[in-house]
A protein has these predicted regions:
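Active-site helical microenvironments for divalent-metal-assisted chemistry
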Residues: 1-321
């Protein structure tokens, strides 16, 4: 699966998000209008994201995450391309998903705003999505995101797609800012993902869900933070370990009959490598960790994220493709 790293921690430029998707100028202009309108509605109530950023910062992230999930679903899960009207409607929902909840407007206001950009059918559908994503009343987040809330998402066409993009955006931002918040958002995803699984029979929503299932696992590796651990392996270590792992038929050694043989060979090599430089505390552990990382893409990406190896994906492909 191809991953497109999103590591910006400044105010996003609109065209940085959408230029890469080859939108027609007409579609780009409409999305720009939707974005500007949503930004102004949130600004009118003095709403900020994380206390300091214009709220459209978060809305851009949600739209960007939706587009990433969508394009990945098309490429890797055989999802069908959306027509321009449906795509525009979903981007409208991404930009307006918090307006009823936060901006003192109601369902029919959202529908009225949507009618500026597309026909009644799509305007109503966009309003339905935004309405379904509006929290219930409650004293805690768990109260507000109760079973009724997730049931509403599950039974509203395409709503789970936008909610998933919203959760991805929250997890990525909190991964940079607060590990506790990241864990809260991750646990929320784990608890709710099956509750909001689309019940409307739209295969596209299930394609998005399949992408998100894999993508969310990799967030800690794809978006490395500054608190990386020190890598104690030399280039020679990496080369030797990678060659051994490469003998294991693209790394899937754990499920192959010759696993014991490869593990024995690795153990002997690790002992030689360790004796070569005993003073490096923790090196033995990293050698073992790297070998296991070479066995499976997810482990490899996590290893690279942990130790700040930004070219991890390229290095993996170098040995296994």
């Amino acid at each position: 699966m191809d991953y497109e790293l999103y590591t910006k921690d400044e105010y996003l430029d609109f065209h940085d998000i959408f230029d890469k998707y080859n939108f027609s100028q007409e579609l780009l202009n409409k999305v720009d209008g939707i974005r500007s309108l949503a930004a102004s509605i949130h600004a009118e109530v003095n709403q900020y994201y994380d206390d300091s950023k214009p709220y459209v910062y978060h809305l851009d992230m949600v739209a960007d995450q939706f587009m990433y999930l969508y394009k990945t679903a098309v490429k890797h899960f055989e999802a069908k391309e959306l027509d321009d009207d449906t795509l525009l409607m979903l981007l409208f929902a991404a930009y307006f998903h918090d307006t009823i909840e936060d901006c003192r407007i109601h369902y029919y206001d959202v529908e009225k705003y949507a009618l500026r950009f597309f026909r009644k059918k799509y305007a109503t559908q966009a309003a339905e999505i935004v309405f379904s994503l509006t929290e219930e009343k409650g004293k805690t987040r768990a109260d507000r995101h109760n079973d009724k809330y997730y049931n509403g998402i599950a039974n509203t066409t395409y709503a789970s797609c936008i909610k998933t993009a919203d959760m991805c955006a929250n997890m990525i931002y909190s991964w940079y800012k607060s590990r506790k918040r990241y864990e809260d958002y991750y646990n929320e995803w784990t608890d709710c993902k099956m509750k909001m699984l689309d019940n409307t029979g739209i295969e596209f929503s299930h394609n998005i869900f399949c992408v998100a299932q894999e993508y969310i696992k990799f967030i800690p590796a794809l978006y490395p933070t500054l608190d990386k651990k020190e890598l104690l392996l030399s280039e020679e270590d990496v080369e030797n370990i990678s060659k051994i792992a490469g003998d294991c038929a693209s790394g899937n050694y754990l499920i192959r009959p010759r696993a014991d043989e490869y593990l024995k060979k690795f153990s002997e090599t690790m002992e030689i490598l360790s004796k070569a430089d005993d003073e490096k505390t923790g090196r033995d552990k990293q050698i073992t960790e790297y070998f296991y990382a070479c066995s499976e893409p997810k482990l490899f990406y996590l290893f690279c994220g942990k130790y700040g190896l930004k070219d991890g994906k390229d290095e993996y492909e170098r040995y296994y493709n």
